[in-house]
Amino acid sequence: MWNEFKAFAMRGNIVDLAIGVVIGGAFGKIVTSLVNDIIMPLVGLLLGGLDFSGLSFTFGDAVVKYGSFIQTIVNFLIISFSIFIVIRTLNGLRRKKEAEEEAAEEAVDAQEELLKEIRDLLKQQAKSPE
């Protein structure tokens, strides 16, 4: 059982996933700090010194902190846009690599076709008497 677990845990995609989760968590903290400590205070300043983190209203005994919700939405938008940019870049690189591979295959195919024609001509010359 231990060997099975070790084989499972050491598979490349599991390790990649673990690394992605750790980096993603750290990136999330950076974005949260960016939004809470830099972007939202600047937006609040532009809106007349409004502090979004303190925006709330009470409904009976319940306190609805919609300012915190707004900050979370901004976090989400920044993270989503960042992921979009990374995926877009990776897809572009992948398409470029595939195009290069296709071009290389076409070059090999053209070369192969030329070699076949030469072979056929040589066979034809060998069969025909001089």
From Swiss-Prot:
Keyword Cytoplasm: no
Keywords: Cell membrane, Ion channel, Ion transport, Membrane, Transmembrane, Transmembrane helix, Transport
Transmembrane segments: 15-43, 66-85
Single Gene Ontology MF annotation: mechanosensitive monoatomic ion channel activity
Topological domain spans for side Extracellular: 44-65
Membrane protein topology class: Multi-pass membrane protein
GO cellular component: membrane; plasma membrane
Family recorded in the similarity comment: Belongs to the MscL family.
Assembly description: Homopentamer.
Protein's name in the database: Large-conductance mechanosensitive channel
Source organism (scientific name): Bacillus subtilis (strain 168)
